[in-house]
Amino acid sequence: MTTTNKDGPFRQQYLPGVHKEPNLAISESTHSSDWYSATSSEDCFQAASQSFSSQKSNGNVITQQPGKLHCEISDPKSCSFVPAISTDNAQMGTSGIIKYRSYSNPDLLVAMSPLAYRDEAPQSQKSVANSRQDLTQTSCEVVTVSETVVNADSITTTTVTSSTTTTATASQEDFIMVEAEQDETAGLCDATMPLVDKKNITTSSTTSSPSRQITPRIENGLSFENVVSLVKIFPAFVNKLLKKPWYASRCDEVCQFPKAELAYYDIVSTDVDDEHFVIVAGKVTTDEHLMDNQFHLVFAPVGFSEDVSLDERPFSLFRATDKKDLMDLLHLCDEKSFLFTSLDMSTMRADILRSKIEELVIQIRLKPHYHMIHVAIATDRLDFFSDGMIKTMNETLEPFESQLRCLCHTENCYPVHLALTMDRQKIVERLLELDPTLFCETDKAGNNVWHHVNSSFCAQIIWDRCPASQHFIDERNMDGQSPLNEAVSTAKPLVATFLIGKGAKFTRGDRNELFVAMTSKNAQSVVEVVLTDKPEIANERDALGNSAIHVALYKESLNALLNRKVELGLDIDVKNNAGETALLLFITTRKPDLLPLLVTLYAHGANMNATDPHGNTALHKSAALVDAKKISLECVKFLISAGSNPNKINLRGESPRHLAASLQNQEMLAILKAAGATRCPKGYKGCRSNCRHDCSSAEDEYEETLQKIRIGNESDYEKTEFTASEKLNIQDTLDGSRRGKKAKVNLISMDGGGIRGLVIIQTLIAIEERLGDDIFKYFDWSAGTSTGSLIMAGLATGKSLREMQQTYLLLKDRVFDGIMPPYDTVQLEKFIQDQFGTGTVWEIPYPRLMISAVNSEKLPVRLEMARNYKPAKDVAPETPKEMPLWMALRRSTAAPVLFKPSEDRYIDGGIISNNPALDLMSEVHAYNRELQLSGRKSDAVQMNVLVSFGTGQIPSTVIETLSIDSNSPLQSIKTIKNLAAMFIDQATASEGAPVARSRQWADSLEIPFFRFSAPLSKNIFLSSTSDLDVCTMMWDSFIYCRKHRDYIDELVKVLKHDTDHPHVKTPFTDL
């Protein structure tokens, strides 16, 4: 006979996602009446009596003591099932005890005395959910047929016989779910189970808890969940059968080590001293277990050991066959280890824990430049911002206040802006509690919180909880976009609706006239007119503290403004409210004319190593932005060529190389390594293999990088190397075998070449860095032609090499500013006077100068030299004492076609002496002979070294034909053109034969000879105004000097060997 009640038949119901069948779980909201088959003890007794005989025949009767509730449990470690008791399967024992057995799980038997039920009936109607104390009054007895006693406080094993009972009084904690043990093979079990009210469980129920779907069991058959579990277990079974690895096939999928596998791995030695993060490798191979040939990056909560408990097993974060691939990630994870160790592993479900760890690893790999707080926001770790976590970080890590203002380099914003952009609503609320002033700050591009907000929810809570931020609702960013403009342009309709509802406008009002002109193309004339009419507005600032220099978008307008910076009292390195100079701001904001803007700023004297409040230079910002294609590599090359320090570190101890290595940008890394960027110091955390201290030596690394950089076809260029006789001359000089009573003088010669004079300057800068001192004071006699004379005069008048570099960048825009030659001669003369003054040549006391020019008044043309000393009487007449220096320079730079002749007769000295090295040596020889003939041989000087500087070697070109054919006029024209180019090339030659002659003459005198002339990747015309061409030429020269450091070092040895240099007094005697 079967008895049913209103709760339906007795069934076992379990939760989806749990593949292992547990046997008993009591819900927090379960009524005690739900565990009985009827509403009265009489019903219970009757039902039991009617089924007693059939139960007895099956041999399943267990003798119980009256007044106790008994449960027979076969596997107490598994507890997903929620039993609903029915009288359908109630059975009566010999002692009058009712026992209930499940349809689907015959191992589960619930037995209770009807007398006990009658005694407890009134109290049993109370809900456990309302008061757990009700259930604590009931004494329960568990018959442990399977030798295990289950208690929610603890699980203990007790060996008993079938007649032995263990009695325990239920406590409040007895009525919770018992956590299911995870299956090691499949790894698919949920770590925790929610509490379920039995009354909400029916055969047709679709929900049992807010987050889980309950699937009814099919009577006398497999449930859907059993089928799912079998499907999930099947691949693991096949893998084990086929001896496939236990971990996932994807190398970046986080997997927890099965306990049985821990014994087969050993820890690999690394430079990271943190037991939580280790690299392990397989160590043994057996018939049953093949050795794992992959390295595993492991997160071990309590260390990597086979003795750990199931809940503390390590996680394999990443796998690779090459240990080096894991080292970078190891250092990154170690730097952010707090994010892993702070996870609440004791209460978190296993699948959720794995998911959170995997999300951390993904973010760290994708965003290696992120600091800890940025990763916490990206992974939505609200617990990171809790009071306990903050206290721990303040005591053991970087202060939390410092982290809140830690700049995110690629996004160029702060954590609060990142949280708004990613719409981390809970984190935003927490930040409002911690420090509302964060929401009044702008990022480096001038965006405030209203620009970043991505949901109306965040917008509303900011509006309500931070009233101060309401004042910025119409503030524009660096691009002139208001928050409402931004919301509309980025398709955020709900945010746009919110802003409009709060009174936001599309525009805040125009800036002053100068600001408008600075953002307009080809508006240089407008800038000049505005400054002439209202010079006072040149120093005005906008709401973000930006000056007119900061907002410039085009080179022409910026040049027009900075040309009057001295007159207007402008500071080119002035900082805005964010603490950034115009240079730093240009790097981080996408300017349409970035490279020309950078060149213009440097030409006018901008500090290339200026820092923001975080200590970041332009190179730091570039290293973070190159990967995002926000800045070109040409800009980076220019910054380095212009003096940006590749080894400067910011306030966090990060160098540009560290940031580039974090992003694994190989091109950027190659540039920095070629520039001499060093690795991070030993012990610095978060380094990847390209910046860690434990790798190859610096010199080997530099050489390897430089060897890979090729400029043109090497066979086209003369090599910078010593001949055997030159090595001997240098050795004799350093050994002192050429000692004598004569004063030794160092000679320097500079070729002509227009704008390519930048090659000479870049080379001199490299030598000066190795010398560690002002190089020009080590030379006693100098000669220069055309652009070489400008450099020589600038250094002689006290300019530094960097100032001369800036002068040349100004020259190309001010002097070569026409569409085509001839260029404005008046502008050239004015520029020379502005840069070198109006003093005379004779006012420069030292060193001796020779400035070449060609007098073209009659044929044959004559080479004339402007000097600041009296030459030998048979060489040339004395230069007039009143000759201005600018006039001598004007004569020497009067390149035919490009400029009108000076005084209608003087043209560029390069026509005859484009490489004045031979003329310089001739001048010294004539001086000594004059003294010898006048009986003052002891006053003669001895040449100590000759250094010749060229303006770069251009790539070779093929001459098609040199034959003139009267039957082919076109060919004849080509021939004439080729002959003209050849004649001009040889007339102005500074490479080839002139260098060979100088080298041989110096060798005959046993004088060390050095020749510097960088190979250029393209032919740069001497009047080129292209910023890209100029920057390429500067970089080619920079790389040339880096490749020939040994050659430069030999020159430095020779210059420093003579203790008389620099001379305290002149070694020369008047003739």
Curated annotation (Swiss-Prot):
Catalytic activity as recorded in UniProt: a 1,2-diacyl-sn-glycero-3-phosphocholine + H2O = a 1-acyl-sn-glycero-3-phosphocholine + a fatty acid + H(+)
Keywords: ANK repeat, Hydrolase, Lipid degradation, Lipid metabolism, Repeat
Entry's Gene Ontology cellular component terms: cytoplasm
Every PNPLA domain range: 748-921
InterPro entries: Acyl_Trfase/lysoPLipase (IPR016035), Ankyrin_rpt (IPR002110), Ankyrin_rpt-contain_sf (IPR036770), PLPL9 (IPR047148), PNPLA_dom (IPR002641)
Locus of motif GXSXG: 784-788
An example Gene Ontology biological process: intestinal lipid catabolic process
Region annotation (Disordered) ranges: 1-22
Disruption phenotype: Mutant animals generate fewer progeny and slower larval development.
First and last residues of every ANK repeat: 411-440, 479-508, 510-539, 544-570, 578-610, 614-651, 652-681
Residue ranges of the motif GXGXXG: 752-757
GO molecular function: actin filament binding; calcium-independent phospholipase A2 activity
EC number, as in UniProt: 3.1.1.4
Active site: residue positions: 786 (nucleophile), 908 (proton acceptor)
Short motif DGA/G, span: 908-910
Top enzyme category: hydrolase
Similarity remark: Belongs to the patatin family.
Function, in words: Phospholipase that plays a critical role during oogenesis, ovulation, and/or embryogenesis.
Record's protein name: Intracellular phospholipase A2
Species name: Caenorhabditis elegans
Organism ancestry: Eukaryota, Metazoa, Ecdysozoa, Nematoda, Chromadorea
Gene encoding the protein: ipla-2
